[in-house]
């Protein structure tokens, strides 16, 4: 009987055979580039598009959720679409396919660039002096910039698709491409420019 121990089985995976997860099983997320350092920590990209609301009761934890899921959640925030997560997810997936076909780029990268471009840097608040409301320009926090960018993208999608012949996924793709290219005709960019113009006048 041999006293030598049997050779252990080879490991299931090695450093040379890493499996990279993909969003929706299609889109790589490992090489996403960020141009705006101020919003970098608030734009999270993960392969998970549905976290089951685990951060819903924790303040500011929304920044740890994938930016794709946050866009999906934004699309549900109307009377008709409330709670229809599968439908909103399907819209985003189909919009991503359209974006990839038209731009030859990773649609996740297009979304990140669109959010960076659509977030206003300044806005106005109203201060009361002796009963008189006076507008005052203030800087926008990076987390709020991301929130407003997603809001503008969702609003632009509704405006383009509600009571029109344009499919909603087509409208969303149009908003993402326009914002990523900083097209002033795109709703998210025009809203950002308008807020910054009003803020500049209130300095």
Curated annotation (Swiss-Prot):
MF terms in GO: rRNA binding; structural constituent of ribosome
Pfam family, one: Ribosomal_S7
Protein name: Small ribosomal subunit protein uS7
HAMAP family according to UniProt: Ribosomal_uS7_A (MF_00480_A)
Function noted in UniProt: One of the primary rRNA binding proteins, it binds directly to 16S rRNA where it nucleates assembly of the head domain of the 30S subunit. Is located at the subunit interface close to the decoding center.
Membrane-spanning parts: none
GO CC, alphabetical: small ribosomal subunit
Region feature Disordered, mapped onto this chain: 1-21
One GO process term, biological-process aspect: translation
Top-level lineage group: Archaea
InterPro entries xrefs: Ribosomal_uS7, Ribosomal_uS7_arc, Ribosomal_uS7_CS, Ribosomal_uS7_dom, Ribosomal_uS7_dom_sf, Ribosomal_uS7_euk/arc
Family: Belongs to the universal ribosomal protein uS7 family.
Keywords: Ribonucleoprotein, Ribosomal protein, RNA-binding, rRNA-binding
Oligomer status and interactors: Part of the 30S ribosomal subunit.
